Design a protein with these regions (language model features):
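Short polar/charged helix/loop
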Residues: 1-175
Length: 175
């Protein structure tokens, strides 16, 4: 067993909801084996309040959560990523920066809870569902014997995880 800590970046377009949820989930559930980050291709500059509410209700950290541009992670000074996951279909379709470190990538697209219209209860329900889908994927990811898998096997397993319950149609096609 290794003491290596893996750097993981979650991407979506606005960096207000799904990627923020995933970052917080991995920070807590990664048990020190992972450094979690999130960013967006076109960040909105603020975190969706429903994302913060759901994370807090589930006992996940929200301090330091901020909407930021993915360019922060494409510089030579940025942490070298081991894994980069897109969690929205539009970010998966964009030309991503060249990430230092040549990370393993996968698309884990789920529906955008911030796009749900309706009552606050309906919006919160959508965020809880997104949280559940992401936590399920992250639980499987953190259980992988990363050190003992070759790159191709690891990439295939990450693709399979991305196709789990809640995957967008595009996530099933991209992977």
């Amino acid at each position: 067993m290794t003491d290596r800590v893996y750097n993981v970046l979650f991407l979506c377009t606005g960096n207000t909801a799904r990627s923020i949820l995933a970052e917080s989930i991995l920070r807590k559930d990664g048990m020190g084996r992972f450094n979690a980050f999130s960013a967006g291709s076109h960040p909105k500059g603020e975190v969706n309040p429903f994302a913060l509410k759901v994370l807090a209700a589930q006992g996940y950290p929200t301090e330091g959560a901020r909407s930021k541009n993915w360019d922060e992670f494409a510089t030579p000074e940025a942490p070298k990523m081991d894994f980069v996951f897109t969690v929205c279909d539009s970010a998966a379709g964009e030309a991503c920066p060249v990430w230092p470190g040549h990370p393993v990538t996968a698309h884990w697209g789920i529906e955008d809870p911030a796009a749900v219209e309706g009552t606050d209860i309906e919006k919160e329900r959508a965020f809880n569902l997104a949280f559940r889908y992401l936590r399920n994927r992250i639980t499987q990811f953190t259980a992988l014997p990363i050190e003992s898998l070759d790159r191709l096997t690891l990439k295939n397993r990450l693709r399979e995880i991305g196709e789990e319950e809640g995957a967008t149609h595009n996530a099933q096609l991209v992977n």
